[in-house]
From Swiss-Prot:
It is found in: Secreted. Belongs to the grammistin family. Group 2 subfamily. Keywords: Antibiotic, Antimicrobial, Cytolysis, Hemolysis, Secreted. One of its GO terms (cellular component) is extracellular region. Has lytic and hemolytic activities. Has antibacterial activity with a broad spectrum against various species of bacteria including both Gram-positive and Gram-negative groups. The lineage of its organism: Eukaryota, Metazoa, Chordata, Craniata, Vertebrata. This is Grammistin Gs E. One of its GO terms (biological process) is killing of cells of another organism. Expressed by the skin glands. Its main location: secreted.
């Protein structure tokens, strides 16, 4: 879901 995508992006940065 959206929250998972945001967490994934935060992990990249």
């Amino acid at each position: 879901f959206i929250g998972g995508i945001i967490s994934f992006i935060k992990k990249l940065f």
